[in-house]
Design a protein with these regions (language model features):
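Structural recognition of the beta-strand scaffold that forms the well-ordered cores
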Residues: 1, 28-34, 91-95, 110, ...
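Acidic/histidine-rich catalytic neighborhood of metal-dependent amide-processing enzymes
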Residues: 1-52, 56, 81
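Solvent-exposed, acidic/flexible segments
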Residues: 6-10, 46-50, 54, 77, ...
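Sec-exported extracytoplasmic/periplasmic mature domains
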Residues: 18-22, 58-66, 86-89, 132-137
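Short catalytic/ligand-gating loop segments at beta-alpha or beta-beta junctions
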Residues: 43, 66-79
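Substrate-binding/catalytic groove segments of enzymes
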Residues: 67-68, 92-93, 101-105
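Short glycine-rich, acidic/polar surface loops and turns
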Residues: 75-100
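His/Asp/Glu-rich mid-to-C-terminal helical/loop segments that flank catalytic regions of hydrolases
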Residues: 102-138
Length: 138
């Protein structure tokens, strides 16, 4: 049996990043939004993101009045943005990694409890506001 890790799931992002590199696309920033629909929105920005984009995310959240919904994380999270970072593109991961029954549990992630009834239109709207503000400032 072959082993599997979370990094094995990045085939699509690796392919897209490689195509963008080959086409010499001028990318100002890759903004990944992952699991940002939770009712108790707590966006985390991991350390392995472009520093300027980390700062931009905080500034954008401040400008939209959503600063309490986003914070920096000193750890590394391997997610689809990593494929772009690896090829030299500026990239950021906006991820809510505290998705679950109780804050910090993350007990819904990749389970049968990860269902549409857990989504919040308000959380999606908040994330959208922040990202639009980021894009406008790029």
């Amino acid at each position: 049996m072959l082993g599997y890790s979370e990094r094995d799931g990045f085939h699509g992002s690796k392919r897209l990043a490689k195509a963008m590199k080959q086409q010499q696309k001028k990318i100002k920033g890759v903004i990944l939004m992952d699991m940002v629909g939770d009712r108790d929105l707590r966006i985390t920005v991991p350390r392995n993101c472009t520093a300027d984009l980390r700062l931009l995310a905080l500034e954008a959240a401040e400008a939209t009045g959503d600063r309490t919904k986003i914070g920096l994380f000193d750890g590394i999270i391997y997610d689809d943005h990593q494929a772009f970072l690896d090829l030299g593109f500026p990239a950021i991961d906006l991820i809510d990694f505290y998705f679950g029954n109780r804050p910090g549990e993350n007990d819904y992630w990749h389970t049968t409890k990860d269902t549409l009834d857990k989504l919040s239109a308000d959380s999606l709207l908040t994330t959208g506001r922040i990202v639009i503000e980021m894009i406008n400032r790029l």
